[in-house]
């Protein structure tokens, strides 16, 4: 007698069917993360293109900010809402716009729309890297690295204005608008002297330096295994052997510096660690600015410079420049406040 042993058929529910469809092999992978990424990225980019094409910033900042008004690619922006709206999300159906699309554009409703969809789109992209890493069986360091840009975006566009009085003080989504925000951070927070900014600069420039050194060193030590003027075509993605000599690279840098990386895994972890840590540190600094925390204040130099007209340092010159930026920028940047500074309070000194 033959006994057949087998599993009872398992019923597949709608979740399993959807899971199979989302993870199907296609030119552009969708996945569960795609349910967040693609709609949010589409909305954020579409909102930005709409705003920069024909939406004015006259009612929020007193500025022209669209192609329709004569701005160009470097000066268009989706600008932040007016200061009076505080931290309202300015929903189209909310009490401010009341379902009126034109009014929603005028009061700056596109800014929170782009900011929030952009933030969730970036998070969706990081989840996409996690998901694909898991499916192909590799570690998720790409997603971990991408947490750096997400931290910067969230801290600059969301955390900073949340710590201030309104979304008005967030950067507008445009090249010149972000330049204005950088000048604002310097004038009102002395951002360049902040140690977290210094760590961010060290991380980004250090990462660029490591990238350049690594690329040049690999190019220097490629095996001459091709007949062409360059060795690019001699490489096969599936080849088992190395395409460059780590031993030669190690010997070269040992002669240059006296020390060199001898472990590829440690080398590449270091290239990951430096820029990502820089991004995270600068994000921490921005959250500090949101709370109006001060960094370095060399009060002794300021007091001596005030008493002794012959004593001045680069620090005291920068403090004067910051005072000038605040005095002349605030009336332009915040016209709704009607700032009027009498002549005697405007900074004077060798720096200006």
Swiss-Prot record:
Protein name as it appears in the record: Photosystem II D2 protein
Binding site for chlorophyll a ChlzD2: 117
EC numbers for this chain: 1.10.3.9
Taxonomy, superkingdom: Bacteria
Gene: psbD
Entry GO CC: photosystem II; plasma membrane-derived thylakoid membrane; plasma membrane-derived thylakoid photosystem II
Protein's GO biological process: photosynthetic electron transport in photosystem II
Higher taxonomy: Bacteria, Bacillati, Cyanobacteriota, Cyanophyceae, Synechococcales
Binding positions for Fe cation per the UniProt entry: 214, 268
Transmembrane segments: 32-53, 109-131, 141-162, 191-217, 266-288
Gene3D superfamilies per record: Photosystem II protein D1-like
Cofactor note: The D1/D2 heterodimer binds P680, chlorophylls that are the primary electron donor of PSII, and subsequent electron acceptors. It shares a non-heme iron and each subunit binds pheophytin, quinone, additional chlorophylls, carotenoids and lipids. There is also a Cl(-1) ion associated with D1 and D2, which is required for oxygen evolution. The PSII complex binds additional chlorophylls, carotenoids and specific lipids.
Catalytic activity: 2 a plastoquinone + 4 hnu + 2 H2O = 2 a plastoquinol + O2
InterPro entries: D1/D2, Photo_II_D1/D2_sf, Photo_RC_L/M, Photo_RC_L/M_CS, PSII_PsbD/D2
Additional facts recorded: 2 of the reaction center chlorophylls (ChlD1 and ChlD2) are entirely coordinated by water.
Binding site for chlorophyll a PD2: 197
Organism field: Synechocystis sp. (strain ATCC 27184 / PCC 6803 / Kazusa)
Keywords: Chlorophyll, Chromophore, Electron transport, Iron, Magnesium, Membrane, Metal-binding, Oxidoreductase, Photosynthesis, Photosystem II, Thylakoid, Transmembrane, Transmembrane helix, Transport
The protein's role, per its UniProt record: Photosystem II (PSII) is a light-driven water:plastoquinone oxidoreductase that uses light energy to abstract electrons from H(2)O, generating O(2) and a proton gradient subsequently used for ATP formation. It consists of a core antenna complex that captures photons, and an electron transfer chain that converts photonic excitation into a charge separation. The D1/D2 (PsbA/PsbD) reaction center heterodimer binds P680, the primary electron donor of PSII as well as several subsequent electron acceptors. D2 is needed for assembly of a stable PSII complex.
Assembly and oligomerization: PSII is composed of 1 copy each of membrane proteins PsbA, PsbB, PsbC, PsbD, PsbE, PsbF, PsbH, PsbI, PsbJ, PsbK, PsbL, PsbM, PsbT, PsbX, PsbY, PsbZ, Psb30/Ycf12, peripheral proteins PsbO, CyanoQ (PsbQ), PsbU, PsbV and a large number of cofactors. It forms dimeric complexes.
Family per similarity comment: Belongs to the reaction center PufL/M/PsbA/D family.
Membrane topology: Multi-pass membrane protein
Annotated GO MF terms: chlorophyll binding; electron transporter, transferring electrons within the cyclic electron transport pathway of photosynthesis activity; iron ion binding; oxygen evolving activity
Ranges of the Lumenal, thylakoid topological domain: 54-108, 163-190, 289-352
SUPFAM superfamilies named in the record: Bacterial photosystem II reaction centre, L and M subunits
